[in-house]
């Protein structure tokens, strides 16, 4: 498996990030969005600094009308990147829910803080990366 992989969970306020290092999926600090151009520039910087070859992007399945809007928004955001490597889209359905569930051992206040500071988003990106890796094995 190529070690130069970055996964992202693109949201309106934050972009969760995760990478693969020595076959271990690790969350990275999220990008806090001020606007889409600033966020795209920051993501471009991460991609260059980490010498990423594959960008894995979480994309909701096409079931509902709001998913269609989200798909368009994510596709537009990714089009702002100057990244020239491979871009793969992976179904992100329930990744945020699962990430929140994985923190159920935490007190409510700490879970809320993890949501606000983007740690939840980076845990979602970890699950997106896990789904990508599983899809490559099958």
Curated annotation (Swiss-Prot):
Keywords: Cytoplasm, Hydrolase, Nuclease, Ribosome biogenesis. It holds the Pfam family RuvX. It comes from the Bacteria. One of its GO terms (biological process) is rRNA 5'-end processing. Its EC number is 3.1.-.-. GO terms for molecular function: nuclease activity. SMART domains: YqgFc. GO terms for cellular component: cytosol. The keyword Glycosyltransferase does not apply. It is found in: Cytoplasm. Could be a nuclease involved in processing of the 5'-end of pre-16S rRNA. Belongs to the YqgF nuclease family. This is Putative pre-16S rRNA nuclease. It comes from Helicobacter hepaticus (strain ATCC 51449 / 3B1).
């Amino acid at each position: 498996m190529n070690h130069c992989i970055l996964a992202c969970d693109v949201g309106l306020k934050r972009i969760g990030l995760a990478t693969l290092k020595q076959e271990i999926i690790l969350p990275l600090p999220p990008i806090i969005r001020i606007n889409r151009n600033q966020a795209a520039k920051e993501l471009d910087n991460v991609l260059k600094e980490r010498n990423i070859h594959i960008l894995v992007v979480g994309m909701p399945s096409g079931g509902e009308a709001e998913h269609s809007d989200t798909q368009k928004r994510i596709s537009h955001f990714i089009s702002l990147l100057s990244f020239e490597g491979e871009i793969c889209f992976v179904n992100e359905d329930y990744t945020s829910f699962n990430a929140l569930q994985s923190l159920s051992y935490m007190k409510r206040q700490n879970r809320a803080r993890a949501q606000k500071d983007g740690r939840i988003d980076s845990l979602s990106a970890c699950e997106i990366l896990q789904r990508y890796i599983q899809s490559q094995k099958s």
